[in-house]
Amino acid sequence: MSRRPKIEEAMKRVESRYELVHAAVRRTLQLLREGEDFFVQEGGEVHKKTFAAIEDIAEGKVKIIKKKEESGSKEE
């Protein structure tokens, strides 16, 4: 049986769902640059790298860095 990513836990580390999506996309791209496979095997289960990205955020394995608002620029 496949388990779901820890979205509720990941939401505790960000201010909004938008920020979680943005961070997960950036982490997924980072994972893809590190390896060729889109899937990762974890404990006998196969998951997409997007799953691994959300897990990394939920477990605090990655640090989410926010750009500070500068005059005339948008905050990310």
Swiss-Prot record:
Signal peptide: none annotated. It catalyses: RNA(n) + a ribonucleoside 5'-triphosphate = RNA(n+1) + diphosphate. PANTHER family: DNA-DIRECTED RNA POLYMERASE SUBUNIT OMEGA. The RNAP catalytic core consists of 2 alpha, 1 beta, 1 beta' and 1 omega subunit. When a sigma factor is associated with the core the holoenzyme is formed, which can initiate transcription. Promotes RNA polymerase assembly. Latches the N- and C-terminal regions of the beta' subunit thereby facilitating its interaction with the beta and alpha subunits. Belongs to the RNA polymerase subunit omega family. This is DNA-directed RNA polymerase subunit omega.
